[in-house]
Amino acid sequence: YEEPANLLKQELREPAIYNAIIKAIAEGASRMNDIKLKVGEEYSVVSKYLKTLIALGIVKKETPITEKPGKKTIYLLADHFFRFWYRFVPANSSAIDSGRIAKTYPYAVKKHLSGYMGLVFEKMCQDYLFYYADDLPVELNEIGQWWGTDSNKKRQIQIDLVGAPAEGKDYIIGSCKYKNEKIGMDELELLREYASVFGKGSRYYYYIFSKAGFT
């Protein structure tokens, strides 16, 4: 079960630093400064190793859709196998080695799956829209996340799904919720607030995806 770690040992020098970077991202560090602090290396070192991981397709760099790369850039694990492994396996290696993982799974893994599955579910929702692109009210150019600052309420916001048009200013704004609770009208109202902060469209079409359904 140690294939990801063994792969790094075979392919890369100093695998410990690569392991530390991947583990930091898997545990939620997405900005360069956060990754640097978790890894304990200088900016130049982390940046160099990140470039290699990006070239290998293990890590990807993302910027809010419709914006140029800059301070808002974040780093995510592009390979979901690596993402799952580094999120759950090292922390539970003792249980795996001793054959206790079936007993520890409910609280060591299962209770955290909704949080882990969030990004996976978002990708599924993006793929769904692309698959049914001919039926959408907007001719899509690209789909991605958007995040930024709501200056009126002094808060950071994130829109799970933004469909940018090939031309014009009609946008799709979406929410993707992988939770056990049903979603109500308050989620639509929140999306409308977020769309006004996004502010790049003249018309918005709202799509809400929910694992548990709707109230």
What are the language-model segments listed below?
Residues 73-215:
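A cross-kingdom feature that marks ATP-driven nucleic-acid transaction machinery
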